[in-house]
Amino acid sequence: LMAYSLMYTIQKYWVNKRRRTQILEKRIAEERQQLDTISVKVMDSMVHALGAKIPGEEEHYLGVAAFAREIALREGMDEQQCADAYSAGLLHEIGMIGIPDALIRREDLSDEEYKVFQTYVPKGYQIITTLHSTGRSEIADAVHYHREAYDGNGFLEGLAGEKIPKLARVLAVADYADRHLRRGESPMLVARLILEQQNRLFEPQSARIMAQMLQEYEVSI
């Protein structure tokens, strides 16, 4: 009887402990979700502020986000990855918040000025990792590595091929496409330029999908 009573007491202790742990984990998850909601609102406000700082840029971010999500979808990525691709597109230049206006507006930058300008990439990574509380790194990594080139001649770290995070490879071609379209270049021309840069600037799969999307758009207009 004593052994049974002891076993019952132990089982009751572990059941109660498990319940307390579950309650605590639920509270932590709820708090993280609340923090993420706040973080998303903060980053959304920063995107709007950056759009006001650089005329036309907010539309560019939305365009890149839409392209990145569609590429991810066509590559068979899951719902979360597609959502991450969209978020990365919105935030890929968020680090511009920390760059002087004079450097953003000028095109004839000196080597030293261009080095300062390039810091928008790590600044963006730092902003996203600071505000995003769940520990998921896909969006931050996509932003951090989206200026890498598929052949290893990009920046910041000179990564090449599969070493570049997948969403960064998607983001690179989405950014290029939207940027060139906003210069007034035709979808067919941009598609051709992208295909010419396969294995150099862009991953072939993402490049072909982006080119196909542009060709479809050209036919539809």
Walk through the language-model features, giving the residues of each:
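Juxtamembrane or sensor-core-proximal signal-transducing alpha helices
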Residues: 2-30
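Signal-transmission linkers at sensory-effector interfaces
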Residues: 31-46
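Polar low-complexity intrinsically disordered regions
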Residues: 1-2, 221
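Metal-dependent catalytic cores of enzymes that make or break cyclic nucleotides
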Residues: 51-221
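Short N-terminal helix-initiation segments at or just after the protein's N-terminus
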Residues: 9, 32-34, 112-117
